[in-house]
């Protein structure tokens, strides 16, 4: 049963254009980069004795982490509850439920903070609970430092570009490749369609001193670039991939070797096609 976990990570590095390359994370078992942290956080919690048989895993998510955790919880026999804003992609909600996990939606106006607060409330209802707390869990950073960061460490890289999100991807790569310029990506709008890039909270694991620049991308521009990636590169990716590539192309005007990530698949956002 655990064999599928061996296929998480070591994703392909694909060329977008002359100066931009990207890790294709949709090839992970559940279809996104979040498989990496879900696996690592669960395994570390088990190792420390924080997560045991009979426990319920409760996490606030914009979708992808919930899907990844639901997959792993299904394999390991844990009950899973995913809490997410009501504007989360319906496809993602259905995918989480397909793994047998429960989903709870919080008001859009409360943004991601509302989902996090709901997990604390739910934690009081269950006697045996483990909260991954991806926004403050140092295992999130460590996972990308020894995983994604290590995978690209031997490549000549001038800059690494990724959505800020939980901060884990950026911080992990920053620690693995200290000489690389670290560029964060955020949505320009308060209410946007780029899931997983800007969640409306400041992650505790985010160290701003390690970020060299933040680039803001409009939702409509991210969607347009996502469609171009499909039509020009043959890569069916999600909206955050379009945002990351746009930001990487801005950075590539100054630097020759820029690496970014394509976090998930376009199948999760049928409404944009």
Whereabouts are the PLM-identified features?
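PLP-dependent amino-acid enzyme catalytic core
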Residues: 1-273
């Amino acid at each position: 049963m655990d064999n599928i976990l061996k296929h998480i990570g070591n994703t392909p590095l694909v060329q977008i254009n002359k100066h931009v390359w990207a890790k294709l994370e949709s090839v992970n078992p559940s279809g996104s980069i979040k498989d990496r942290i879900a696996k690592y956080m669960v395994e570390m919690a088990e190792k420390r004795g924080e997560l045991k048989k009979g426990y319920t895993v409760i996490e606030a998510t914009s979708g992808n982490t919930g899907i990844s955790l639901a997959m792993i919880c299904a394999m390991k026999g844990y009950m899973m509850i995913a809490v997410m804003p009501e504007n989360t992609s319906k496809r993602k909600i259905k995918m989480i439920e397909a793994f047998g996990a429960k989903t709870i939606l919080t008001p859009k106006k409360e943004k991601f903070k509302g989902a996090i607060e709901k997990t604390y409330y739910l934690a009081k209802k269950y006697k045996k609970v483990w909260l991954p707390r991806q926004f403050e869990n140092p295992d999130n950073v460590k996972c990308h430092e020894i995983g994604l960061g290590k995978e690209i460490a031997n490549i000549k890289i001038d800059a690494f570009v990724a959505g800020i999100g939980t901060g884990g991807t950026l911080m992990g790569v920053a620690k693995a490749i200290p000489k690389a310029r670290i560029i964060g990506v955020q949505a320009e709008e308060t209410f946007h369609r780029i899931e997983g890039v800007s969640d409306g909270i400041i992650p505790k694991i985010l160290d701003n001193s390690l970020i060299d620049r933040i680039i803001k991308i409009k939702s409509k521009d991210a969607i347009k670039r996502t469609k171009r990636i499909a039509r020009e590169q043959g890569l069916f990716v999600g909206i955050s991939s379009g945002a990351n590539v746009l930001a990487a192309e801005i950075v590539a005007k100054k630097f020759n070797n820029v690496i970014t990530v394509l976090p998930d698949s376009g199948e999760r956002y049928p409404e944009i096609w």
